[in-house]
Every structure is written in structure tokens, then in C-alpha cells.
């Protein structure tokens, strides 16, 4: 689901930017900021880069379910659905600084307009994803961004961080099947 959510966000942002600036080529890439050897990947040049920087499990469990009723009335016992928040670093990487700022501004506009992506706003949302919410992460300012870029092994670039909320990861494993309880009378067993 993580890959599907990132690919969908990439495609949706890419289409927005292509429409806004009248572009024919793709301008958004989901990729790491720096290769293992410390260089900027070629595919990142003159692109808006989306990279996953953190994953956290959603701790509010009121929407989780463990048992699912089957057509025959019995229940399927599966592991709990788990929901995660993904932290995305969005960094335009253009040779011209003005282009970097232009695409950063347009990216912020995209997430302001599309704070929620679901089937009502996009018919192309992937199967298994019902809703994605995006929340701007203000963090602790300059020092936090400096530390992040240092940890990534890269030079700072103008960028923003968004929290993508509630990506559900569901296990396909079934733990057990359980019979349903049928009550046919109000009598107790002792009667």
C-alpha cells in the first residue's frame, strides 16, 4: 500500500503541474534524494522529488477490525488492519533557482487544493486505498530541516514536508474461521 499511495500521489501531483505549466513531459519523480554513493540520481535532475522520510503507525485504533462476516454467516478472523502515516519530503530540484521556487509554490498550492484525495475527488485512486489526507508539517523550523538534509547526506534545497495520513496495510493472512452464534429460543441450557 505504501508504494501504491506514493505512486498515486506522484501521478496526481505530476498531472496538476503539467496542466498548470502546460508541460508535456513528466516533472515529478518518487525517488531517494541521494544515491548510496552520495550523488544525486540522474532521474532527479529538473524534477520535483517526492521521497519517503518517515513512517509511523496510527495509534488510534477505533477504526480497526479483526473479524469479517462471510456470506455464509460465519466469520473470518484476520490480523488487525493497521494504518500508517507517511511523511513525505517534497523537494523541487531544478538548475535554475527561480524554477525551483516556482515548482515549490505550485506544489504547496496542489496540497492546499487537494488536502484529501478519495474516490470523490479522483476516480483513479488505487484499489485498497479509500482516502489519503495530506497535512503540512511545520516542524521545528530551520534546525529541523538542516538536520534532515544532513541526515540524507545532501545539500539543503527548498522543500516542504507533508504527512500523508491513514495508509492502511492489511494482511492477507487468515488466522482462523469462527462459526456464527445462532439463537433460536430464549431457553437456557438448564431448562
Model-derived segments and spans:
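Active-site-adjacent structural patch at catalytic or cofactor/ligand-binding sites
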Residues: 51-59, 63-93
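"Short basic amphipathic alpha-helical interaction patches in structured regions
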Residues: 64-69, 100-108, 122-125
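A generic structural motif
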Residues: 91-98, 168
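Small/polar-rich, solvent-exposed N-terminal microdomains that initiate assembly or binding
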Residues: 1-66, 128
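Short, cationic low-complexity segments
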Residues: 73-79, 177-191
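Short conserved micro-motifs at the rims of enzyme active sites and ligand-binding pockets
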Residues: 61-63, 172-176
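Acidic-leaning, charged glycine-interspersed low-complexity segments
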Residues: 102, 112-169
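Short glycine/proline-enriched loop/turn "hinge" motifs that connect secondary-structure elements
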Residues: 42-44, 77-82, 152-156
Amino acid at each position: 500500500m505504501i508504494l501504491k499511495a506514493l505512486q498515486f500521489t506522484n501521478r496526481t501531483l505530476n498531472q496538476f503541474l503539467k496542466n498548470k505549466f502546460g508541460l508535456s513531459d513528466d516533472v515529478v519523480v518518487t525517488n531517494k534524494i541521494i544515491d548510496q554513493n552520495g550523488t544525486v540520481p540522474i532521474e532527479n535532475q529538473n524534477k520535483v522529488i517526492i521521497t519517503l522520510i518517515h513512517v509511523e503507525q496510527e495509534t488510534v485504533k477505533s477504526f480497526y477490525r479483526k473479524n469479517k462476516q462471510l456470506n455464509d454467516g460465519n466469520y473470518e478472523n484476520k490480523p488487525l488492519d493497521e494504518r500508517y502515516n507517511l511523511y513525505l519530503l517534497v523537494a523541487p530540484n531544478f538548475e535554475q533557482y527561480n524554477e525551483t521556487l516556482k515548482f515549490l509554490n505550485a506544489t504547496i498550492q496542489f496540497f492546499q487544493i487537494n488536502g484529501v484525495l478519495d474516490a470523490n475527488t479522483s476516480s483513479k485512486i488505487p484499489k485498497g486505498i479509500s482516502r489519503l489526507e495530506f497535512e503540512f508539517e511545520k516542524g521545528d523550523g530551520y534546525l529541523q530541516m538542516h538536520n534532515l538534509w544532513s541526515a540524507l547526506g545532501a545539500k539543503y534545497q527548498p522543500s516542504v514536508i507533508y504527512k500523508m495520513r491513514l495508509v492502511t496495510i492489511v494482511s492477507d493472512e487468515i488466522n482462523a474461521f469462527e462459526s456464527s452464534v445462532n439463537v433460536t429460543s430464549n431457553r437456557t441450557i438448564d431448562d
